Curated annotation (Swiss-Prot):
EC number: 3.1.1.-
Class of this enzyme: hydrolase
Organism: Arabidopsis thaliana
Any single Gene Ontology cellular-component annotation: extracellular region
Name used for this protein in its record: GDSL esterase/lipase At1g71250
List of glycosylated residues: 162
Gene Ontology MF terms in the entry: lipase activity
Record family assignment: Belongs to the 'GDSL' lipolytic enzyme family.
Keywords: Glycoprotein, Hydrolase, Lipid degradation, Lipid metabolism, Secreted, Signal
GO biological process terms, semicolon-separated: lipid catabolic process
Domain of life (superkingdom): Eukaryota
Length: 374
């Protein structure tokens, strides 16, 4: 596809785009460096962007346990909302640890939890009500309960001093916010939040709830916490397909709504770092990273930025990927796998930018630098 850069321009609210030289450096970083694990464990909370299969065990329509999901994981659908690996799988490789298993899987117990657990659940939001239109899901609050269950088990598996050190060196990743908009605020036919709250007030509601749980992580003894912001949702096929803007343009009104949340989350990270001795909270600038990819697709090897590889209708985003649907053959040239989620190739770029990137990608330090702090 011949993308028109002027038409595709993503407005990213003042964020600085990465220079071509930085792009080249990030893309040339090795996929996996053999050696000692950089962290003892990684605990993952979030939504479908990082779900590793928890929703397979819930009564919900938000599932990805069927082909063509997993087509590039030896045709094995695991519940990941991707053609292959998620952001977390690829970050785990960079950290040189196994990808954390899903909490809801009955086999996630014993020694299997020692290097971390994934609690993420498709359709989950910061607010309990977000995503209810899909059925069962573990909200942020429930995922925190599930995390505490795991920590109680781990406490019995090591000495008190070792447990304290283990928690302090482990990494926590939280990926929330998308469903509070896509499956709440931007669905006025099902939710009244857009009537009750102006965009800044809704963002403040989300941030206050988020802050409470981020502080809870500190009280539990966790000290390294990575918090990616929300991507430019107005550019995903699902939102393009609504017909608010031409099909080759992002929905700017949606992206503008997200600005307050992302800016507030970055400010919250500053506040948390000031009031949490010995901890490091890091903001991941997903909005800018995706915006950079969409504005400069050729620099990353992409040729299709405005429609899904697997989906139906306008932008292949009106109906998301269906069981046994035939996806596009050139998946590494697509930014979006289905109506909502990036391809494995796009996830790989996001993971590398989080791990190696400058402060415009990960603030105030990147994930690699986080692992070196004690």
């Amino acid at each position: 596809m011949n993308t028109n850069r002027k038409k595709m321009k993503v407005h990213i609210g003042g964020y600085v785009l990465i220079l071509a030289l930085t792009v080249s450096v990030i893309l040339q970083q090795p996929e996996l460096v053999t050696g000692q694990a950089r962290v003892p464990a990684m605990f993952v909370l979030g939504d479908s962007l990082v779900d590793a299969g928890n929703n397979n065990f819930l009564q919900t329509v938000a599932r990805a346990n069927f082909l063509p999901y997993g087509i590039d994981m030896n045709y094995q659908p695991t519940g990941r909302f991707s053609n292959g690996l998620t952001f977390i799988d690829l970050l785990a490789r960079l950290l040189e640890i196994p990808s954390p298993p899903p909490f809801a899987d009955p086999t996630t117990s014993g020694n299997r939890i020692l290097q971390g657990v994934n609690y993420a659940s498709a359709a989950a939001g910061i607010l309990d009500v977000s995503g209810y239109n899909y059925g069962g899901r573990f909200s942020l609050n429930q995922q925190m309960v599930n995390l505490e269950t795991t920590l109680s088990q781990l406490r019995t598996m090591m000495s008190p001093q070792n447990f304290t050190d283990y928690l302090a060196r482990s990494l926590v990743v939280l990926v929330f916010g998308s469903n509070d908009y896509i499956n709440n605020y931007l669905m006025p036919n099902l939710y009244d939040s857009s009537i009750r709250f102006r965009p800044p007030d809704f963002a403040n509601l989300l941030l206050s709830q988020y802050a409470r749980q981020l502080l809870t992580l500190y009280s539990l003894g966790l000290r390294k916490i990575f918090i990616p912001g929300v991507a430019p949702l107005g550019c995903i096929p699902n939102q393009r397909a609504r017909g608010i803007s031409p099909p080759d343009r992002c929905v700017d009104s949606v992206n503008q709504i997200l600005g307050t949340f992302n800016q507030g989350l970055k400010s919250l990270v500053d506040q948390l770092n000031q009031r949490s001795p010995g901890a490091i909270y890091v903001y991941g600038n997903t909005y800018s990273a995706i915006g950079d990819i969409l504005n400069n697709p050729a620099a990353y090897g992409f040729s299709v930025v405005d429609r899904a590889c697997c989906g139906i209708g306008r932008n292949q985003g009106q109906i998301t990927c269906l069981p046994l649907q035939t996806p596009c053959p050139n998946r590494n040239q697509y930014v979006f796998w289905d109506a909502f989620h990036p391809t494995q190739t796009a996830n790989s770029i996001l993971a590398r930018r989080a791990f190696y990137g400058p402060p415009s990608d990960a603030y105030p330090v990147n994930v690699q630098q986080m692992t070196l702090l004690h």
